[in-house]
A protein has these predicted regions:
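Short, flexible catalytic-loop segment of classical short-chain dehydrogenase/reductase
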Residues: 184-194, 198
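Short, small/polar-rich loop/turn modules that mediate ligand/substrate recognition or access, typified
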Residues: 173, 178, 239-241
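C-terminal substrate-recognition "lid" of short-chain dehydrogenase/reductases
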Residues: 118, 217-246, 251
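Active-site helix of classical SDR
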Residues: 121, 157, 165
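Residue(s) in the substrate-gating loop at a strand-loop-helix junction
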Residues: 141
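Conserved glycine-rich Rossmann-like NAD(P)H-binding loop of the short-chain dehydrogenase/reductase
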Residues: 33-47
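Substrate-binding pocket helix/loop in short-chain dehydrogenase/reductase
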Residues: 97-98, 105-110, 209
Length: 253
């Protein structure tokens, strides 16, 4: 069977954190698959460039601001159409254990990683349910499954994403909603590059991050994007409420 035969009919796909990393790779994957991609990010300059390259629609949005999210999704429905697939991908992390974390660090991490999903999902769910269903894919992390040193807020927020995803399935699967999460291991994104650049010993830090995976390699944004694409495709129909681990074997032992 050809790749074309596996492609779903063109849909409106909204992706947050779409200007770089996993979000950008996911935008490219869905655009290649023939979908109408709507890219959201707070980095307006980068977003405009990347969206133009894909001939995609883009909106600058502050995911820490409920009013910004609501206005953006109202504009999407007016300008593009009803959302068929929502990919909640945007995320941030702070390098701190609990005692060295500030409340602002903790709150902002949850605002971007978790609370934004409350607002984005509420913005699309009513329309999805009226039309008989829809697809939501949330980017969690293996950090939501295992503890990582100096990532207290990040680990906790990603565990919350997994729980939130399961609750969506429990509440709405019988009405046609498919909600799943992806849990990547260490992925070679710009964010990881910044962590390495500020490390006391970048070479040792890179080695330790690579060795988390049993194959000794980081994943690529494109590999995670392929998993997100699968979960949103007809081939992923039977997956619902799942947390797909893509971690090079990190959590196998």
């Amino acid at each position: 069977m050809t790749d074309t035969e596996h492609r779903p009919t063109s849909r409106v796909v909204v992706i947050t954190g779409a200007a770089s990393g996993i979000g950008l790779a996911t935008s490219r994957r869905f655009a290649t698959g023939g979908d109408t991609v709507v890219m959201l990010d707070i980095d307006s300059d980068r977003l405009v460039v990347e969206a133009a390259a894909l001939t995609s629609t883009s909106y600058t949005v502050d995911l820490c601001n409920a009013e910004s999210i609501a206005a953006t999704f109202t504009a999407i429905e007016t300008d593009v159409g009803c959302v068929d697939v929502l990919v909640n991908n945007a995320g941030i992390g702070v390098a701190a254990d609990l005692l060295s974390s500030t409340w602002l660090d903790w709150q902002r991490t949850f605002d971007v990683n978790v609370h934004s999903m409350f607002h984005t999902c509420r913005a699309v769910l009513a329309s999805m349910l009226e039309r008989g269903g829809g697809i939501i894919v949330n980017t969690a992390s293996v950090a939501g499954l295992v503890g990582i040193r100096d990532r207290a807020a990040y680990c906790t927020s990603k565990a919350a994403v997994i729980g939130f995803t399961r609750s969506l399935t429990a509440d709405y699967a019988h009405r046609g909603i498919r909600a799943n999460a992806v849990c990547p291991g260490t992925v070679a994104t710009e964010w990881i590059g910044k962590i390495l650049a500020t490390a006391d010993d970048p070479v040792a830090k890179r080695l330790s991050m690579e060795q988390r995976q049993l194959d000794g390699q980081m994943g690529s944004p494109e590999e995670v994007a392929a998993a997100i694409w699968f979960l949103a495709s007809p081939d992923g129909r039977f997956a619902n409420g799942s947390s797909m681990v893509i971690d090079g074997g990190w959590t196998a032992m």
